[in-house]
Amino acid sequence: MAASGRGLSRALHSTPCPAWKRVQSGANGCLKPEYDAVVIGAGHNGLVAAAYLQRLGVNTAVFERRHVIGGAAVTEEIIPGFKFSRASYLLSLLRPQIYTDLELKKHGLKLHLRNPYSFTPMLEEGTLSKPPRSLLLGTDVAENQKQISQFSRKDAQAFPRYEEFMKRLVLAIDPLLDAAPVDIAALQHGSLLQRLRALSTLRPLLKAGRTLGAQLPQYYEVLTAPISKVLDQWFESEPLKATLATDAVIGAMTSPHTPGSGYVLLHHVMGSLEGMQGAWSYVQGGMGALSDAIASSATAHGASIFTEKTVAKVQVNSEGRVQGVVLQGGEEVRSRVVLSCASPQVTFLELTPQEWLPGAFVKRISQLDTQSPVTKINVAVDRLPNFQAAPNAPGDQPQAHHQCSIHLNCEDTLLLHQAFEDAKGGLPSQRPMIELCIPSSLDPTLAPTGCHVVSLFTQYTPYTLAGGKVWDEQKKNTYADKVFDCIEAYAPGFKRSVLGRDILTPQDLERIFGLPGGNIFHGAMSLDQLYFARPVPQHSDYRCPVQGLYLCGSGAHPGGGVMGAAGRNAAHIVFRDLKNM
């Protein structure tokens, strides 16, 4: 649907040139034949790795195949006048050290913290001239309890205890995110020096155990059990359980009844922004502004970033060691090391010469679970959605609930499970799980005056439809129409407000952003693909079977989300190895 109609008459402002591009046009903007390090892909992890390496004195170049940096953390003006965080759309998980070390605030990063942060309207008839109920959650404990007590007084009393329980688990796991997993191979078979070094990798794990103490069995259950079982032990009201369960299935082809879904919930509550645990924010200017800030930090110290430069091949010498990359145009760029921010599948099955990779390793990479349930729909509207459960104020000004993640079709965990079952049968969900966000409610720079950008993160849509059918434009639009019908039931008039939309199925997410299977994490965040086993067992320390080749994207430990930890951790491993070469 093309953008048209009201609100688009305002002259469009030209987007200012990001600071990293202004620096890039200088001396470090020319492609050199050799660098110390080459990074494949300017996703946020690749940019973080480059920024750290350059600060450590490692001359680094980043090659990005698209015209824009950021990978999935990108801002694109798909519809004239409307700037969309086209894939990733919220910030919380970015490691605090990265925010500080790279001086991202100095390099232009501005955040809009959300409080309240979650809104779940009910699809029910109002009573006695009152609107339908809704659940609004934020950082105010008393207000949360008041909201929850609409559905269960018992749950209102339990909720603060639940949050404290989860915070302790987050505190335990937090140190594991900022270091490579325990080096089991070195502990078992390494030299004395290697074993001594490997002992240090045990510290975060031991610290986690001490933090959990006698409650370790209960926390183990959170990580391994279905999240529905965990939530049933705490609560009785379905709206609260379903709202919390969305964090356990977001981006995952799993149901709340799937064992291990608890970790994905934990993954989405372990963030911290500006000292606020669990806070989520919109980035001023969209998620691409975060990538621009990281790039600015990198180029300010001398890193080179090139767009529309596709790496076609990792070069390996006759001794089995990396010696650089070959670009799509045939240009050879030599380097001592190569870091890949691309997915494990692209890195090892497409870019790396297969003769240098063990067959067992290639087989494991090819068998990684990359199922994705996600279709992302970016929408331009000429007015705010008007929810029956929380009618708009006169003047159509954003209210507290408009800044939240708005959960639709989430009144009951059974709805989430049924939506999952549809997709397992090869069909788009009849009642999709919808997370609706309106970043322009806090950041008016994203849309023309009076208009808004709406992000719809929807599940569940299979990569391949029943009968082996693929997503064509008709099927995409039919699904989007179904999503809009669902929103219309909660917010009548929504469909009339739509000026344009951008529909990204799992196949689109793979094609445009390089997300394997459309999986936003570069691979499932299931326990069999985490920590020791990410991307595969014995290769969780960012190093690869080819000497000098490293994985630094979301397919490496600790996984997906706009976290930057994989890029930071890999950079430190690379720097240590360079010193020992």
UniProtKB/Swiss-Prot annotation:
Enzyme class, spelled out: oxidoreductase
Binding site for FAD: 38-71
Pfam families for the chain: Amino_oxidase
Primary location recorded for the protein, binned into one broad class: mitochondrion
Compartment(s) where it occurs, according to its Swiss-Prot or TrEMBL record: Mitochondrion matrix
Keywords on record: FAD, Flavoprotein, Mitochondrion, Oxidoreductase
GO BP: any one term: mitochondrion organization
Catalytic activity, EC: 1.-.-.-
Any single Gene Ontology cellular-component annotation: mitochondrial matrix
Superkingdom of origin organism: Eukaryota
GO molecular function, one term: oxidoreductase activity
The protein's role, per its UniProt record: Probable oxidoreductase that may play a role as regulator of mitochondrial function.
Subunit (UniProt): Interacts with COX5B; this interaction may contribute to localize PYROXD2 to the inner face of the inner mitochondrial membrane.
Family the entry assigns: Belongs to the carotenoid/retinoid oxidoreductase family.
UniProt protein name: Pyridine nucleotide-disulfide oxidoreductase domain-containing protein 2
